[in-house]
């Protein structure tokens, strides 16, 4: 009889789960510790036990999806990993199927994820996920940002996570199918970004706000992994970005079809989603405002 079991994790399993994380993601101790100290919850982690040991895991981080102007409960599949000696046995597929059942039982309407590589899109498609999210990648020179921010000087601003989340909701809630997070998720995204040498850059004036998460991606290149701003707040944010993270070029991730740097950049599928009941993918991708993922923690 097989001793293989799928179950929710329990407190006290962190050491074994951390070992899997570090082996599978070739991760250093500090970022690994940060996840398990700040984002891990056993009720959000499914494990596959084989022969008395944890062979694989998936984390189902609480999230939401925009639908008809409302936030609908969902989960984000994160940290999906199988130890090398247990791969190609179907353990991860079993966990993904189970995650759908567990999510539906707790009220989640969607499951979504960001494949670690292009080759994995086909793999996840086999478990019902579709490439719904789109991100526009725009590269902007420091010189262009200086022109945009002409007349603005750096103004030190630190928005609260509540302010950031409110702005994010205002910009994305009407973009059906987009991923929404809570303040806890924003705090985690900020913290893990800083552990990789990144920064949170903010702007605020007369009640209008903007923010960006950024990090250096190579010599002279700053990767802006999320930028939330209206056109009128972009100049002030650009001034603060130039000061906080000097670089020659800035590669910015933006929602597809948005007003910032309109018509520029390359639009790519960046994430997948699976409905757990109700709405179909086809309805969510109607219109010009393609669903946006963001805060992928990649």
Predicted regions and their residues:
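Amide-forming acyltransferase catalytic core, primarily the GNAT-like/NAT-type
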Residues: 130-232
